[in-house]
Amino acid sequence: DVAVHLDHGLTLETVKKALELGFTSVMLDASRDPFEENIKKTKEVVKLAAEYGATVEAELGLVGGSEDGKSDHGIQCTNPQDARIFCEQTDVDALAVAIGNAHGDYPVAPTLEFGVLEEIRDITGKPLVLHGGS
């Protein structure tokens, strides 16, 4: 099997188009939205993806760095309790978290908070995704 994943989709319309094209996994990146809005949008994506038999990744917390020509070095670690609530309310298949990781090039090596990662793993039971790991 081959998985085709939409990473960092910015609108529900983009996610829907990807699903219509046969993507097997999608991500609506609502991580910059307020917590409740992220939950609301992600729930919509989970419901839509289920109609296509696709999996859903969501992002919680802010992963800084530079990607697609945009630069933002503001990293906010994912709060483990927020991750628990988010996963319970959305039923996402995988959760991208921020533990000090950053997209793209960074002038100083990031400090990863592995304790936070372990706590999120233990409290959610979901597969976790780390963006900016290379």
State the predicted function of each range.
Residues A3, H8-P127:
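Alpha/beta enzyme core
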Residues G132-S134:
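Short acidic/histidine-rich active-site segments
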